[in-house]
Each structure stands twice: as structure tokens, then as C-alpha cells.
Curated annotation (Swiss-Prot):
Family: Belongs to the UPF0225 family.
NCBIfam families: PRK01617.1, PRK01752.1
Organism: Serratia proteamaculans (strain 568)
The protein's name in its UniProt record: UPF0225 protein Spro_2712
HAMAP family named in the record: UPF0225
InterPro entries: NTF2-like_dom_sf (IPR032710), SEC_C_motif (IPR004027), UPF0225 (IPR023006), YchJ-like_M (IPR048469)
Amino acid sequence: MPELCPCGSGLEYSACCEPYVNGTQTPATPGLLMRSRFSAYVKHNVDYLIATWHPDCHATEWRNAIVDSFKNTEWLGLTVVEEKQGHEAGEGFVEFIAQFVDGNTGERQAMHERSRFLQIDQRWYYIDGTKPQPGRNAICPCGSGKKYKKCCGR
């Protein structure tokens, strides 16, 4: 049976993020880069993650910490909330929710981020992100179905 892409596109991995993660293609948009980076986390491809961080981040210094994080995180799924161009040329934003199980606690959690990407020489790079705060009465991004104030917002 074909392996579906971890990014949640519904496509086979070989026809979706694998060519990016393996370095045979370059993501043309911030959204494609973000999806391929999620897939790289799932596949434990530290080299791709480091290569797609903006050079100013000096991600090679984090190699061991990234590899260690693979042992304690089981990524469950990705939801892209919004993709937008930035105000400056060569800047883009992707808001997403990534669900995972924390291997230390066994708890299901969610990472909600608005990631910022910058383009250098026709290549997109992850530079940083902010964590949007859901409203207290909004559904919790962890996927529990509860209101944020009764779940992760306590």
C-alpha cells in the first residue's frame, strides 16, 4: 500500500514532500516548505530541517537537540490554517496546528504557530514564528474538542 504524506495533503509521500526532503526539488512557496519541514520532523531528517532554517538562525548548532527531540515526539498530524504573503517581497507566513504526543508525558498536545519565511536566491527558509493565542471560548487547537479555557488555556 502506498505511503501517504505525513503533511496531510492526501497525496503519496513520494509525490508530495519526499522530493523536497530528499533534496531533489525545492519548495516553491512557504506553505510547501512548511509542509515538507513537518514531514522531515516525522521522518527524522535533521539534515533537511537544518538546511531549510534561515542562515541567520545558525541551526547547525541545534543538531543534537533536534535529534534528541525525535525520541520524545510522535507527530500525529498537520492542519494548515492560513498561508499569506508578507508586506515585503520575499516574505511569507504560514499559520498551522501540528498535533503530537509528548513522549515524556504521553499526553496529546498541539503546536499552534504562525511561521515566518524569507526567500534568498529563489529559495524559501524558515526564520521564526509566533504562537497565536486562541480566544478563551474557541475550540482548543489540541484536538480535544473542548473550549480552550477548559483545556490547554487553564
